[in-house]
Amino acid sequence: MKLKSAFSQLMFKYVTVLGLALTLGTAYAQAEKETPAKGVMWEVKSEKNTAYLFGSFHLAKASFYPMPEAVEQAYKQADTLVVEVDTTDAKAAEKTMPLFTYAAPDKLENHISKKTWENLQAMVGSSVVQFQSLKPTIAATALTLSLFRQQGYDASKGVDLHYLLRAKQDKKDIVELESLAFQASMLGSLNDEDADAMLAQTLDGLKNGDILRETADMIEAWKNGDAENLAKILLHAANKDAGSKKLMKILLDDRNPGMTEKIVDMLNKEKKLFIVVGAGHFSGPNSILDMLEKQGLQVRQIK
């Protein structure tokens, strides 16, 4: 049986059950060239080893493939695929879901501001009842996934999942930099103030088109192999306001040191590594690349 992303399947279940049919921001849906992606990849050298780091998008389209020959060769020569998490682990995904939901009689409305609840009601209408069991972070994710599914993006076509499935088929070793439990705990355990801010920001970004526009711009830069522009777009999105800065700190900056430490440890061994991590982790002053360079490793982009 063909493996799929267990976590994305669970998320798809929520999106489907909620019956979401968002049309917000679709006016921006720019004409996208249906061509294979170049992506962004870096070579990292230590005294003992060389690894290749490839920036991923967790949502993608079939038209993104095949990847460039340089990326394919980096994958093929690797003994080990390194990813953020193994999203095909159905048991791990099932175990994480309680961290994202409220047990009755508790509900979402009790944990977010009146304004955020009213904005959610205005956006999803009668489907808002189905949100009551979800924590704000999963509600925000479901809303965003719904919008991008309408634009043709699919978690089952995501770059990390693409290589995970191939690595399993090719019998390569697979190493996680994090775990689903860690990621779920990180998002599911946000205090009410931060979780409310995340959901409120998502609702605003969906309504005004910023989420679609900024993500589409980042994907276009990634497809063109333009790491510099990708970093600029992400930096702009991250510094729009205090809420954006806080969110990016939680999602990227706070996680990068731990992932960097594990990458450095693996580079001190002799395994050939192909590392696939969300492209956002390779951008900015607190990026994984920046931290690797500060530890004396040689980093260069493969163009």
Annotate each PLM feature.
Residues 36, 63-66, 254-258:
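Short secondary-structure boundary/capping elements
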Residues 11-25:
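Bacterial N-terminal signal peptides
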Residues 32-40:
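N-terminal low-complexity, Pro/Thr/Ser-rich intrinsically disordered segments
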